[in-house]
Amino acid sequence: MQDISNHTPMIQQYLKIKSQYQDILLFYRMGDFYELFFDDAKKAAELLDITLTARGKSNGESIPMAGVPYHAAEAYIAKIVKKGLSIAICEQTGDPNTSKGPVERQVTRIITPATVSEEAFLDNNQDSILVSIFEKNNKYYLAYTSYTQGKIYLVKTLTSLNELKNTVLKLSPQEIITNSHELAQQNPFKKPIKALEEWYYSNFEAKKYINDSLDTNIANNILNLYKNDQLTTIGSILSYLTNILKDTPRHITDISYEQEQDTLNIDINSRINLELDNNSKSSLLSIIGKCKTSLGSRLLKRYFSNPTRNLNILATRHSIINSLGENQHFLKIQDVLSYISDIERIISRVALGTVKPKDLVALRDSLEQLPILKKLLSEKNTPEITNINNRIHQLDELVTLLDKAIIENPPTTIRDGGVIKEGFDKELDELKSIKDNSYDFLIKFEELQKQKTGISTLKVGYNRVHGYYIELSKQHADKIPTEYVRRQTLKASERYITEELKNFEDKVLSSKEKALAREKLIYDTLLKKVIEYYKQIQETAASIAEIDVLANFAERAIKLKLSQPKFNNLAKLELKEVRHLAIEHNIDEPFIPNDTLLSKDTNTLQIITGPNMGGKSTYMRQVAQLIFLAYIGSFVPASYADICDIDTIYTRIGASDDISSGRSTFMVEMTETAYILNNASAKSLVIMDEIGRGTSTFDGLALAKACAEKFAQIGAFTLFATHYFELTELAKQYPNVCNIHFEAKEYKDNIYFMHKAVTGAAKKSYGIQVAKLAGISQDVLESAKQNLYNLEKKQQLTESTQVQAQFQLEPTTQNPLQQKLDAIDINTITPLEALNILFELKKR
């Protein structure tokens, strides 16, 4: 640490504390403000748009300073946290009246993007995720926690940076910690990331924190179940949280392992291409996600992150959706759910010490809805719904306690009291009555003093600096009784106090202090009582979230005309009248549905041709979205859906230059294609849209053909849209390849898209007609038509030569054997003639 002896004592104290928190902003409490100094002040002034000033000089230089009022700090902190930065809160812990030198101060809390619990800092509909990455021997061990959910999840060991990136971005964390300084420096995730000191990833320390933080039985189970490197990753989260909280994270009550074999995998590019869960109004989540609670919205996002292939889980969800859909029973349930607050986060705030009085009122009001909800669920007496209902705990005792203890509209904090309801505590009521009755005493006392002095303008008042006083104008100085003691002199008046008024003041102020202390004690005791229900409330919250999502699915099924999918083990995907929900939602005319059939026995690869705007991309996307919906347990936009086991969805749709990495559009396209080719299997669904456009015609055709052939050989279910009509010939070479196209009709120089998938290859691309629709001027269109005519004429003359130049490695001169073969008409010769020709050629 640098020499700080030339600084003032207060700045010396600040610098000592700041040296322990160099990478985060230090909010340093001074009276009614949190102050920031030096570089922190400059950064905060820019981030928060607050004034940058200077506080005198220290070590001969002006000290940059910026500050925010402590009572408004929450709003400023929220801005900083949402920008991905962290803050250390440094409070005055010493008594200013007894301190010699600067008041003692300590950092009481660290606030980071993923470790906040206050409502102002959080997105109600999104989990606050902290990811830990332990890199060792070119492997990545990953664990994450949804902070306010109170759980840690362990992910399978990852063996490549690309796999790690996809896993992390799927989680969309607010914060990442790691042992790898190189990974933190590269930051391929573009998320807040920090490399921690080595001890955070010590296996010895990890086991210690697991034992200290978790229930004994859970800790023992974890230590026996997982390997050392996995334990190290789990322990890193617990040690980090302990350091952040300055306390043991007791709210973490569960550790679980995510089984990848039960998950439908979708890489981050495919998620973006399919518009699954981005923030746009056209995303699938925005159309499907109409949950009534924050609990349900967050759970639905988890479903979107981890679609399950577990058929038992899917069958359970479908059964509940059907039950809730009967007579639209979900409407009654959703009405009750709309009154339930975020009890999961409220109980976490209780455990973390950040709960506010209004949270307790919201908790009480939410728990009051549970008997109604349980009754509605019991009306659907199915095993699946009963199972959920049994995990919703009716906490009548807690409701009664909170109802008796907390006033209806409490203040924001307990700091100034006024939270506990009258009648809850006798001692508190007595202390408050002294203050409440003070007004009557002061009225009587003032009237008595007026009579005693004969001064009708005499006033009795109070201010926070001088306390209670008797105020008289200076013109009445000759009438002042001898027992009046001067307290304050003003320009036109004097203020006095008497022994009686001083005794009353001491009694009132003492009662206020005692009442506030008593109220805080009652409040703390109340929170300890509430936390006894932690596990029951967490389990109740999880069950409410589940029923909210499924009631939402039931409502969406009816509103959007969705049907229940079936699952088969026949390697067959049969879909009828499939629709694209976002497009259907955003157009005025009726959406034209399409059928899709993919089967190992008939076709696994569809070559899709047709004009731009004809419907090719929509067709492919809607199939992928349907599969995705089926695997989150929703009903699907089709009249019929029979789905086989799909373990991964890959897409190669659209592209743009990756300028920051120096990669062209074509390079991006090829990189993504290579990833798909290297990982696709017979259980994959692959969407390929117009591959090979970013290079020369024949290079593009060659690559597109080779990729299509590879997918045919793999047997992956592949929808392959292309403008290379030559690829339609693959259907003659591979029995598992078929052609479909999207029709268009021409009428009086206009084009009309049918948006209907038809068997066979397209015969025309209609590019010029599409250009006309786009608004290209008539003179350009006429020129294009002439150019097209010339090009087609030229191609007819040179096509065979060009194709040979592109694909043929041998000399173009045919040998006699080749000439003989070319002369044979295989459509007219008999089998016997063919054998004779073969025998003759063999003799040569």
UniProtKB/Swiss-Prot annotation:
Q: Which InterPro entries match?
A: DNA_mismatch_repair_MutS (IPR005748), DNA_mismatch_repair_MutS-lik_N (IPR007695), DNA_mismatch_repair_MutS/MSH (IPR017261), DNA_mismatch_repair_MutS_C (IPR000432), DNA_mismatch_repair_MutS_clamp (IPR007861), DNA_mismatch_repair_MutS_core (IPR007696), DNA_mismatch_repair_MutS_N (IPR016151), DNA_mismatch_repair_MutS_sf (IPR036187)
Q: Which UniProt keywords apply?
A: ATP-binding, DNA damage, DNA repair, DNA-binding, Nucleotide-binding
Q: Which residues bind ATP?
A: 610-617
Domain of life where this protein originates:
Bacteria
Instruction: List the SUPFAM superfamilies.
Output: DNA repair protein MutS, domain I, DNA repair protein MutS, domain II, DNA repair protein MutS, domain III, P-loop containing nucleoside triphosphate hydrolases
Keyword check for DNA repair: yes
**Molecular function via GO:** ATP binding; ATP-dependent DNA damage sensor activity; damaged DNA binding; mismatched DNA binding
Name any Gene Ontology BP term: mismatch repair
A GO CC annotation recorded here is: cytosol
On whether ATP-binding is a keyword of this UniProt record, the answer is yes
What sections of the protein cross the membrane?
A: none
Q: What does this protein do?
A: This protein is involved in the repair of mismatches in DNA. It is possible that it carries out the mismatch recognition step. This protein has a weak ATPase activity.
Family assignment from sequence similarity: Belongs to the DNA mismatch repair MutS family.
Q: What protein name applies here?
A: DNA mismatch repair protein MutS
